[in-house]
Amino acid sequence: MTNKKIVNSWNEWDPLKHVIVGRADDCCIPAPEPALDAKVPEDSGMKGKHGPRTKDSVDKANQLLNDFASLLEKRGIKVDRPVPLNHNQKVSTPDWEVESMFGCMPARDIILTVGNEMLEATMSYRCRSVSYTHLTLPTNREV
């Protein structure tokens, strides 16, 4: 028997069977980049700050994500969690470079399931340009 990846999402109202719930481990506040100007309010506590988030904020976010994953599992939904990755490292292309990645907490933002395909949703934040790579790995199993 071959181990094939099965993804099926043709509408928004069928029962949920399998989902990815992110992790807050090593999430970073994005360094200044063009997309942030329009999205970070002037009075935000993030304005002018970047780098790793505080341990307290990561712990609180992980508790919420863990509780959510547990709730889904109790309802019989298969839950995959991304493998933690050090997001406090540079990301670059020949055209640009940013000081750190964002994180893998909001998995739904970067993977769009249409039918039997998982599509990368384009991110305006450069720091999220490679976020999808480690999110798809745990889903390479039969549903």
Region locations from a protein language model:
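N-terminal leader/transition segments
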Residues: 1-93, 97
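A generic, well-ordered mixed alpha/beta core segment in the N-terminal half of proteins
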Residues: 99-135
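Surface-exposed loop/turn and secondary-structure junction residues enriched for glycine/proline
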Residues: 16-19, 108, 140
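Single conserved hydrophobic/aromatic residue that forms the stacking wall/gate
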Residues: 134-143
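General beta-strand structural signal in soluble alpha/beta enzymes
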Residues: 80-83, 120-122, 141
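Short, glycine/serine-rich, charged loops/turns that create anion-binding
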Residues: 25-26, 125, 142
